[in-house]
Amino acid sequence: MAVFVGLLGLSGMPRADEPLPQAFAVPAGVNHNTFMVAGDSITAAGSRKVAVGHVGEASWVRYVNTPGTPATLAWTGGWALGGAQSGDMAVALRAGSADSLVILAGTNDLAHGNSHTMIGENLARIARIVRAPMVLLSSIPPRDDAVAATVAYNEFLKTFAGERGWTYVDASAGLRSEANTFIEGLSDDGVHPNVEGAKILGAAIGQALTTKPMQAIADTAGVEPLG
């Protein structure tokens, strides 16, 4: 277990702490859908400075906007760190507001044997911290050495999101083979997406943020987020 838990941290991930070009800066005169994040190494991708606007090269956050088109999504805050469990996110995430809150959590919880019930309680706590009309809960990527647990957890997330009135997106679908492992070439360690995998994950999350969320924002203006 200790070896596996270590793998879920920063092992095999880029160490670059480069700023995302649009991080925490929404260009004037352009309509953007803003989002905050709560996550682990799949979001941080080696960075320890996500809270101040830095993610690694293999973070999905970099790839939510369609290449070659005007950016419509702006990342404006949140927290993520390699090895983080959902409870860590609920403690470390700071209050804020955005059009959407994207939560991608649970890989490390599964490694530590946390129950779905415990994780669900932490996810609800996370959602209460950020004022966002849209809570977008994403599936977690495959884990090649824990296929059954990952499949069951993603099913739990889908059901949980529906019960809370959140939006669920199976953003990891494009990473998954028929055997529910990583498609070859999309991960270097069977746990974390590499850059090519992050592009697929980010595109799926970006699509979810630019379709359903905008209608949800219009429908729920002034409504407190569910928690």
Residue spans for each PLM region:
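Oxyanion-hole/transition-state-stabilizing segment in secreted/luminal serine hydrolases
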Residues: 84-120, 140-143
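Hydrophobic membrane-insertion alpha-helices, especially the h-region
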Residues: 1-9
